[in-house]
Amino acid sequence: LNIKRSSYMLSKIYGEALYNFSNLPIINLRIHNIYGPRMGMSHVIPELIFRSLNSKKYLEVYSPNHKRCFCFIHDAVNITYKLLTNKKVNKDTLNLGSDKNEISMIKLGKLIVKLLNKNIKVIGLKNNPGSPTRRVPSLKKLNKKINYKYNYNLVDGLKITIDWYKKNLSYKT
């Protein structure tokens, strides 16, 4: 398939088929905008960090008015552990992420630039084709299964993520 994100889509379909047609104790987690250290470069947060670190004049942000909620990896791992160790959770499909602190991509770019103490302008560009304008998961089912208080807000998680990328990636200054 040449459709962008087709392998991602097919893995979700396969996982749901396994979930529906097996007797295995399965929890189907739909992961939404998890971020943190070591996540590679093909996601918006590390990309904005890297491009901000390498820029002397400006940061270009695609889909500037599209909005997302982000969940720091430590919270995602803790939620997953709570679900896996809860014997009442079985044969469930649950969204995993955060529905707090919704932020536009342009504001995310400005926040990253601010946290990096860079004096560069943030410029909004065209929308990426196929990118949803808003991605905020419904966590109603998750909240009925477990009680979880998030430990990391967006700024705290970004500080940790930025620190890791600064120490572990080569970038020009």
Each language-model region and where it sits:
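NAD(P)-dependent short-chain dehydrogenase/reductase
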Residues: 9, 13, 17-82, 109-113
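C-terminal substrate-binding subdomain of Rossmann-fold SDR/epimerase-dehydratase oxidoreductases
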Residues: 53-173
